Amino acid sequence: MALFAVIGEFADDQDLRLRTRPTHREYLRSLFDVGKIAMSGPWEDETGMLIVYDVADMAEAEHLLAQDPYRSAGVLANATIKEWRVVLRAPWSNDNQ
C-alpha cells in the first residue's frame, strides 16, 4: 500500500458544501472503516481539505476521489493527488483519537 495526499480547494458555494457535507463525511467514514483513509479534514480557514488515502496505487486514489460526493456535487474547485513518501512518523499517528 502507498499513501496519496489529496489537496482540495473548495468552490465558493458554501451552501452547497454544507448541504453535501453529511454524505461526504459518510463516504469518508466508510473508506476509513476499511483502512483506505489514513486521515482527513478541512483546512482551519475552510478553504479546502486534505485527505490521505492508503491504497494500492494512483488509479485507486483517483477512483476514490471521483466517487467522493464533494467531487460529484462540484464542491471541489480543484483537487490534486500526489503520492506521499513519509520520512518521519510520530508514534501516536496511528491513534484515531
Task: Give residue spans per PLM region.
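Conserved, structured core segments of small domains
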Residues: 1-97
